[in-house]
């Protein structure tokens, strides 16, 4: 297969790197980790070559990773509810939490893009709540 090269926003790149770092911490299967580590190395290399980091960007990345870590836990908890066919108050709370955290995640990614002058920006628009 040919290599696919696409331009992405800095926020999207850091989001993906943060998720891969979480996977490296959570996933234990050596075969899966081999692919995760490879993808992480490729993306991290592109970040280091193409993005000038500073304290603000480091802080935004840390916050983005914290949000993604919370989302990981929530999604695991939702799967347990699914497994137990429990779609009551806890499932509803978890599902709502995903919306709120994803809104925060989008704001952080946009802030990263604005801070770094990224040409590409992920723009979101949802019904207000």
Describe the residue ranges of each PLM region.
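Extended, charge-rich alpha-helical interface modules
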Residues: 1-129
